[in-house]
């Protein structure tokens, strides 16, 4: 059994980790931790629906974690995880970090977009970007996983085969993404349903969203050249689910059916990626509460643009589910275990 701990359980991703790991056949949850002693209480007092788990939330204690955990999931806010990670790694504990603190390979880029000084720069080089389907071999050997963001997961998985096959123009990629309100965190979701619901709106327009450098970084790695995108996120009046529509200029005319075959070949054997048939319409309801990413595409022959639609559950494949998938890879378990 893999002994697991979770640091930070009061947010959506922490709760989702509990849901998945509590049913995982190869996992024993050995520790739950808050950021301070003020969070010490029994799990059932926070989440009554987990009353089958006789666990207490303890104050963060690295020495204790090192003794009872093989791996720790960090469901902490940005700019908090990098205060914790060095102590855990130095104590020999594997870490899967769900924040953005170790996703960007250049610390100056992180500092510019997150407006905070990175205090654990030397650990950035030790991290592996945890997009499970693209970095499997590196994840197997990793001590520190930087779990991808939800928007980047939909976009990068949606674009990767086209980028690697080289039949698209990397200039002028336009991405229009919609997220359920849980993507902005529990506090924001509560405020939304109190003050705005029902509503549908764009936010962080004109290149302001923090996931932009993450998407550009990984697409640039795939292509071998710098990629710049135009990205506009939106909030939907549903709790969970994420849909990204991606518009890319083609270098030459290729039939939709041929592109679908390229995608299926690229993702051959990857259980959680589904490439749909031509003319199949995607919706978020198809992936809710699952770790699947479903992708459909069609060439607009009039404009010679490739239109890609990529959907996930932002709390599962976009966060906690992919984190567990990465844990499975790290410990030599079937990727589908617990998922």
Swiss-Prot record:
Record-annotated active site: 150
Catalysed reaction, written as an equation: N-acetyl-L-glutamate 5-semialdehyde + phosphate + NADP(+) = N-acetyl-L-glutamyl 5-phosphate + NADPH + H(+)
PROSITE patterns: ARGC
Function: Catalyzes the NADPH-dependent reduction of N-acetyl-5-glutamyl phosphate to yield N-acetyl-L-glutamate 5-semialdehyde.
Location(s), subcellular: Cytoplasm
Annotated transmembrane regions: none
A GO-annotated cellular component: cytoplasm
SMART domains named among the record's database cross-references: Semialdhyde_dh
GO biological process, one term: L-arginine biosynthetic process
Matches recorded under Gene3D superfamilies: Dihydrodipicolinate Reductase, domain 2 (3.30.360.10), NAD(P)-binding Rossmann-like Domain (3.40.50.720)
Metabolic or biological pathway: Amino-acid biosynthesis; L-arginine biosynthesis; N(2)-acetyl-L-ornithine from L-glutamate: step 3/4
EC number: 1.2.1.38
Keyword annotations of the record: Amino-acid biosynthesis, Arginine biosynthesis, Cytoplasm, NADP, Oxidoreductase
Gene that this polypeptide is encoded by: argC
Species: Endomicrobium trichonymphae
Similarity annotation: Belongs to the NAGSA dehydrogenase family. Type 1 subfamily.
InterPro entries: AGPR_AS, AGPR_type-1, NAD(P)-bd_dom_sf, NAGSA_dehydrogenase, Semialdehyde_DH_NAD-bd
Database matches in Pfam families: Semialdhyde_dh (PF01118), Semialdhyde_dhC_1 (PF22698)
Full protein name: N-acetyl-gamma-glutamyl-phosphate reductase
GO molecular function: N-acetyl-gamma-glutamyl-phosphate reductase activity; NAD binding; NADP+ binding
């Amino acid at each position: 059994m893999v002994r697991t701990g979770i640091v930070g359980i009061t947010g959506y991703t922490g709760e989702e980790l509990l849901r998945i790991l509590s049913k995982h056949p190869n996992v024993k949850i050995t520790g739950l931790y808050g950021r301070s002693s003020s969070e010490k209480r029994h799990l059932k007092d926070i989440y009554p629906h987990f009353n089958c788990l006789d666990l207490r939330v303890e104050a963060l204690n690295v020495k204790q974690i090192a003794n009872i955990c093989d791996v720790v999931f960090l469901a902490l806010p940005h700019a908090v995880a990098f205060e914790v990670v060095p102590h855990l790694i130095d104590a020999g504990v594997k870490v899967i970090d769900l924040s953005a603190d170790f996703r960007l390979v250049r610390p100056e880029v992180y500092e510019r977009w997150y407006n905070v000084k990175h205090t654990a720069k030397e650990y950035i080089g030790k991290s592996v970007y945890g997009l499970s389907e693209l970095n499997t071999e590196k994840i197997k050997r990793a001590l520190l996983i930087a779990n991808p963001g939800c928007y980047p997961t939909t976009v990068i998985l949606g674009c990767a085969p086209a980028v690697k096959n080289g039949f698209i123009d990397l200039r002028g990629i336009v991405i229009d993404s919609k997220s359920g309100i849980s993507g902005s965190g529990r506090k924001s979701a509560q405020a939304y349903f109190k003050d705005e619901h029902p509503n549908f709106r764009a936010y962080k327009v004109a290149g302001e969203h923090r996931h932009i450098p993450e998407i550009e970084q990984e697409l640039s790695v795939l292509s071998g050249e710098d990629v710049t995108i135009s990205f506009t996120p939106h909030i939907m009046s549903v709790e969970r689910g994420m849909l990204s529509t991606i518009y890319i200029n083609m270098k030459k005319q290729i039939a939709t059916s041929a592109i679908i075959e390229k995608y299926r070949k690229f993702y051959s054997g990857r259980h959680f990626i589904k490439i749909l048939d031509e003319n199949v319409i995607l919706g978020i309801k198809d992936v809710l509460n699952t770790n699947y990413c479903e992708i459909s595409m069609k060439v607009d022959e009039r404009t010679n643009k490739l239109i890609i639609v990529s959907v996930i559950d932002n709390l599962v494949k976009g966060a906690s589910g992919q984190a567990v998938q990465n844990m499975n890879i790290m410990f030599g378990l079937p990727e589908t275990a617990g998922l």
